[in-house]
Amino acid sequence: MKKLLLPIILLNFSSIAFAQEPKMLPIGFAPGEELLMDSYLKSRVSRAPITTPPTLPVRTAAQWEESQALLITWTGFPSIHRQIIAAAQLECKVIIHCADSNVVKSDLVANGVPLTNLKYIEVPFNSIWIRDYAANTCYLNDVDSLILVDWIYNRPRPDDDDIPLAYSSFLNVPLYQTEVAPNNLMNTGGNWMIDGMGTAFASELILEENDGAGAYSIAYPNHTSTVIDQIVEDFHGINRYIKMDVLPYDDIHHIDMHMKFLDERTILVGKFPTGVSDGPQMEANLLWVLSNYTDPWGNPYKIVRVPMPPSTSGAYAPSASYRTYSNFVIVNKTVIMPVYRQEYDTTAVRIIKESMPGYKVVTIDADNSGANLISQGGVIHCITHSVGVTDPLRIVHNYLNDTYNSTTPYQIDAIVQHKSGIANASVYWTTDTTMPYTAASMTLTGATTDTWTGYIPAQPVGTQIFYYIKGQANSGKQQVRPMPAPAGWWKFKILGTVSIEENLANVFSTSVFPNPSHGLTCIPVNSNRKLSGKLYITDVTGKVVQVVHTGDFKQGGSNYFINTSEWTSGVYTIVAETNEGVTAQKLLVK
């Protein structure tokens, strides 16, 4: 695959991994490694059987889809690996790449970890960072055939580069590689965030490492952004590749160190104290994304913020290791996340649990003496990868928002797919999660799009409805979404009907946030019908400091964004002036 004809110095370096427990390599370049990249890349010879794009439509799976296996490489941090294995083996197989399986088994037994649901591949390796060098789960025709897609790894570590060939062969899954021109592409799993519907996020590292020079003064690969987009569309089915500016203090420029898709509509994003570390660039990137992109259904992305914790001394990058809570892995119904210190961990765990109801959240301390994984530049997501199931039953749903409708049923549409076809689907709903759910049958309403439709009966004003969707394939396989259902669910609330005066008041039915503000700030605007007007902000003298929006306010909810990082501290007024009147809300800028 990737290591033939290598220089002698590189071969000697890589062979350490199999001969003995390897010296720990960081997630970034180790001293001297960058100098090896030129000769390493020039000498690469692919051993993968498939280096051309799939001929059938391809879709890259999201992390919340069903996994058959979690992947790790056993080296360097056995105490952390034990905890990952103990949590993941309850959800799926754990495939352990290792030098000696007997050593691994003895360690697990000695520390009380069952040897159940585990598979071992004895294979040479260079490092622990399997997220970056493993292949990605994709499906042909949405759900029909499982394949794996691998890229050129951006480190001169040939044994790591061969890991995808080892486990794809072990699982008997076809392996595609972007190894051969004109489809040669360098990429890394930490800089790859997928929604399962054709959208990918990345930092502009993807451009830097494929511009013909990169950091290595080499002429390979050499692609424009347009060509890169075409390669990921051909191999991954990605039709929207969103590339953000790199963060100045995240040395590896992997976005999994500060953000993560929680579902198709929701993005978890780290939050630094105002003006600190990568905070300003992170806020600017987020504002740019929200101003230019929507979720697959045209809704503004729902953003969940989680604090970026400091070091024990209170320092942030570049004066300390880059600690983050977003670097977790979703393994079917379990979230395995890094933690650091209780004073920050409690808030982060609460945010994850509230944002992903029903998921079991397992925490692993990555900042302990003797197990200080974060000091190496990555955490849990960085040292794990996954392989999807061979027969996914896929359910995709644009979940309902709060509504003023209390008289007509609530339509539930979902894409439900399986390679054997779908026998039936139902929506289950309740107004009290301590009580049983009621099933409502769904019918196939879009044969070409695999869309199924059902209805929840109308409910009185003030009711909160919890619901999930279940599908059954012709093969008999069943699946629910959200996957932890009925413990997990979507929810929406029935709001009251309003008069003109009340409708005007409801323009700001949700408060601006964060408030106080210093940086990216969201102004939610809501209306139960279309209104015309403008949204602007005044200072204490009444002077207009920014016009945010002029024109129509659509029915329902819209989010508008401002950046107050350069504003003078004080009290400002956000004004919504419509054809039905004026309403206002105070904003404090720190």
Please annotate each region the language model reported.
Residues 387-498:
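Glycan-association/targeting regions that enable binding to alpha-glucans and other polysaccharides
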Residues 20-394:
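The feature marks the mature, well-folded catalytic cores of soluble enzymes
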Residues 4, 17-19, 502-590:
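C-terminal outer-membrane/trafficking sorting elements
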Residues 64-66, 88, 404-408, 419-421, ...:
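Solvent-exposed loop and beta-edge segments used for protein-protein assembly and interaction
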Residues 72, 304-306, 440-442, 492, ...:
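Generic detection of short hydrophobic beta-strand segments and adjacent strand-loop junctions
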Residues 139-142, 197, 474, 577-581:
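Short strand-coil-strand connectors
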Residues 1-22:
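Bacterial Sec-dependent N-terminal signal peptides
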